[in-house]
Amino acid sequence: MNTESLVAALSQNNVKLARTLLLANLLEETQGKNSWDCPHYTADRAVQESIALCEANNDRMTYFGLENLRDRYFLRDANDAICENPQTFFARVATGMARGDRAFAQELYDYMSKGWFIPATPVLMNIGTSKGLCISCFLNTVPDTLEGIFDIYRENAFLAKFGGGIGTDWSQLRGQNAPLKSSGLRSSGVIPFLKIMDSETLAISRNSHRRGAAAAYLRIDHPDIEDFLEIRKPTGGDMDRKCLNINHGVVITDAFMEAVEARQPYKLVCPHTGTITKELDAMEIWRKLLTMRAETGEPYFLYIDTVNRSIPPHHKELRLLVRQSNLCTEIVLPTTNDRTA
């Protein structure tokens, strides 16, 4: 492809011409190549070769779709050159998902190639390879021990490295200035540990295509909730207590919302001892929540009692509880100190 021609087409807002030029370049660049030229390829080559490709479906692709696939998703060979084009890419993903079923692989390919269906990003990037996970979201909870906290840091680092978005519940940690029996000192609270999570998230690149992403969750009745609400606010306060690289969500209880409706105070409770540490004006905290949402788009809201009333019977029989949600607050699964969902 003539790069000058592509630049000229884009500068003239001729996106259709730019798409044609980009597609021609991709097909020329990958001529004689296929997914299995990637050293990480692990899919069933025989199944992939059996898929009947429809090159005419390339015309369904937009310029921006092609550019995104080329930049993020197509596999590369040992020389870091692209070895997939749109149709071989869809065939590789379909093969990985079909697990040896040729008819199903063909059906999946047809759906994706026609634009009827597309899997999540980790599937597109990793399936049929040894590069990473095909799971988008993970949920875990942090125990109130130093060992447990740093175990979570390690787990989150590898989950982010291999393509996962993470939702971590920090509500078990005792609040700031709570006594520590083992040392006779007092706890630094949740926020300094979130600062480490914030730096870790910035440092870990998710599959080298985008930064690792994580959300921290804290109960509305946690002693550190007031500071937690402001960790994403870029102005005011101590920057050592800001966490601008992670998302955050508040786990809201029925008791809090009832206090808001009744214009009454509500209690902050130490998760370690169960003692009441403070009372706050529920309506003022609710206003602060809404103000932060208006200013920063966060925190997320998770109405935890509503969720736990609706969990499946087999979870209830095992006495499992949902503590938080995932990075995007659309998945709710039970977690424990030794169970990552």
Enumerate the language-model features and the residues they cover.
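Extended catalytic cores of very large enzyme megasubunits
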Residues: 1-341
